[in-house]
Amino acid sequence: MKKEQLGKNLKYMRECHNMSQSQLAGKLWLDRSSISGYEIGKRMPDILILWEMAEIMNVSLDELVGRKKMSKAAGL
């Protein structure tokens, strides 16, 4: 999994859900700087955080990390 692809997908999904970095961070019990680091490809979340992100965004883990195209069911 490429950090850059995850970051692009995460930012796209977050923005489609009209969520700020701070709002997403709050749902995950993280700092906003962590979300920023994930989105710009400087940090990689652990599997539990990835799982929670996918649940919040209503997508599969494969869709979040870029292994599968995002489904229309995700509302994106």
Regions found by a protein language model. Give the residues of each.
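Residue-level detection of the helix-turn-helix DNA-binding "recognition helix"
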Residues: 11, 15, 29, 40-42, ...
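Alpha-helical residues within the helix-turn-helix
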Residues: 15, 26, 55
